[in-house]
Regions:
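Structural signature of eukaryotic scaffold interfaces centered on beta-propeller domains
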Residues: 19-35, 40-41, 86-100, 187-203, ...
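Post-signal peptide N-terminal segment of secreted/secretory-pathway proteins
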Residues: 1-84
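Hydrophilic extracytoplasmic domains
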Residues: 9-18, 199-203, 207-267
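Surface-exposed loop and turn segments in beta-propeller and other repeat-based domains
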Residues: 3-19, 72-91, 168-190, 233-255
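Short glycine/acidic-enriched loop and turn motifs that connect beta-strands
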Residues: 39-53, 89-90, 110-114, 210-214
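Loop-centered beta-sheet repeat module
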Residues: 154-162, 168-230
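Beta-propeller blade signature
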Residues: 2-3, 51-68, 119-170, 218-235
């Protein structure tokens, strides 16, 4: 990919630098960077006794003006995506929202990888969910899976937001609500941002309740597509704000959303 600028003749002109950006599932802007993120296999040095690799965040930083492209160092265990929420599951990030020099991102639980499924003798597999562990490789494209994985989350009635101190994503605070399911729209391998700030500094976190599409009831959310809020000046969910989108739309949900102006959003 490459970037463009408007020249003196008011024409779009390509910059000289061209970049082979690695695979990503979400993206956003922070300070001078266009950032991308995905979750993938970590270094072989971190393999467990079975040879299974942990999932880690794979980040890219494109500085358009300087025409530089860098990535994170996955030797740093701070980028570990495994057991990110304390329930054994790995996560992927959906959205990169810059707010007061921090990054807000939805942490979307993805289930147990081979690495997570075997950890501590399978301690993270909930009782009664043993049959959800895959017994062979299968699926295709973004829904492919490997033997030993427990694909998709066991906790569909939770929404987590990670608040990172800066673009390195190495230090964070996690906040949780059980009013909505995880906050992202999804199309194949892309996890769409559904967390946006209003002009007054409030942050609105939308969930389309994608987990309603899960085939197994144990992994299917019972929560409506809805929205919650993080009030300006706080880093917690507002306990007094919840809005069911389905209740106001005849049971309909949405795929994506964007901030327009003020506290208006387009879905």
């Amino acid at each position: 990919t490459r970037s463009y600028f408007m020249n003196a003749n008011y024409e779009m002109q390509a910059r000289s630098g061209e970049y082979a950006v690695k695979r990503f599932t979400t993206y956003g802007i922070y300070d001078k960077y266009i950032m991308t993120s995905s979750t993938g296999d970590g270094p072989t040095e971190y393999a467990d006794e079975n040879g299974y690799l942990p999932k880690m965040f794979l980040l890219s930083y494109l500085d358009v003006a300087a025409e530089t492209y860098t990535t994170n160092n996955t030797q740093n265990k701070a980028y570990m995506s495994e057991n990110f929420l304390g329930n054994g599951e790995f996560v992927t990030l959906a959205g990169i929202l810059e707010h007061h020099n921090k990054i807000y991102s939805a942490a979307v639980p993805m289930g147990l990888s081979q690495y997570g499924g075997k950890a501590n003798g399978g301690q993270w597999i909930l009782p009664g969910n043993e049959d959800l562990v895959k017994t062979e490789d299968g699926g295709s494209n973004s829904s492919s899976y490997k033997k030993g994985e427990l694909q998709w989350t066991q906790y569909p009635n939770e929404c987590w937001v990670a608040i990172f101190d800066d673009e390195t994503l190495t230090t964070k605070k996690l906040i949780k609500t059980e009013q909505i399911s995880y906050a992202c729209g999804r199309m194949k391998s892309q996890y769409y941002q559904t967390i946006w700030s209003a002009d007054n500094g409030d942050i609105y976190v939308f969930s389309p309740s994608y987990a309603k599409t899960m085939s197994d009831a144990r992994q299917r959310t019972t929560l409506d597509a809805g929205v919650v809020r993080i009030k300006a000046g706080t880093e917690e969910f507002d306990p007094n704000y919840y809005y069911s989108i389905e209740a106001q739309s005849g049971g309909k949900s949405f795929l994506r959303c964007w901030h327009l102006t003020g506290d208006y959003f387009l879905m």
